[in-house]
Amino acid sequence: MIHSVLIFNNDGLPRLMKFYTKVDIPTQKLLLQQVHSLISTRSAQECSFITPPSLLEDLDDIKVIYRHYATLYFVFIVDDQESELGILDLIQVFVECLDKCFSNVCELDLVFGWQVLQTVLEEIVQGGMVIDTNINRIVAAVDEANSQKNVNSNGSTISASILSSLSRDRGFWGR
């Protein structure tokens, strides 16, 4: 299971912090600081898998897997059921999707286009489980969600891809 996805810059400023397990905010901040301090001192030739920071030391089955792209670190905190190489590939898929959505993504795109960043991640991972890794399908779903937002009765937005999948099912909704 994926417990957390972190994206932060070289200075340790978070650009995305998504937790799939319950973690209080002070612990999230401390975890970000500890992970940044461990990763930022490593060279590009070193392995992309690190031992967990002291905050996670008591958990035997936790792994920290990361990739460094330009000024950003993409970090996944996972349990031992996940493949390290599979997560590295997943990070690559995530970055390639962002690159297609933003036309050569940079840190400012993630700051000002945080909705797209969240949508891309939600198309790939939900509830800590990987649901899709097909770049073309993910980008198409994000494009559809961005171009056709529908407003429900509460005024919140529901993406068209979710609505279309519900209408295709027609099991409950067709009554």
Curated annotation (Swiss-Prot):
Biological process terms in GO annotation: Golgi to vacuole transport; protein targeting to vacuole; vesicle-mediated transport
Cellular localization per UniProt: Golgi apparatus; Cytoplasmic vesicle membrane
UniProtKB keywords: Cytoplasmic vesicle, Golgi apparatus, Membrane, Protein transport, Transport, Virulence
Primary location class: Golgi
Membrane topology label: Peripheral membrane protein
The keyword Transport belongs to this UniProt entry's keyword annotation: yes
Origin superkingdom: Eukaryota
PROSITE patterns: CLAT_ADAPTOR_S
One GO CC term, this protein: intracellular membrane-bounded organelle
Similarity comment text for this entry: Belongs to the adaptor complexes small subunit family.
Job of this protein: Part of the AP-3 complex, an adapter-related complex which is not clathrin-associated. The complex is associated with the Golgi region as well as more peripheral structures. It facilitates the budding of vesicles from the Golgi membrane. Involved in vacuolar trafficking and contributes to hyphal growth and pathogenesis.
Assembly and oligomerization: Adaptor protein complex 3 (AP-3) is a heterotetramer composed of 2 large adaptins, a medium adaptin and a small adaptin.
Annotated protein name in UniProt: Clathrin-associated protein AP-3 complex component APS3
Organism lineage string: Eukaryota, Fungi, Dikarya, Ascomycota, Saccharomycotina
Gene it is expressed from: APS3
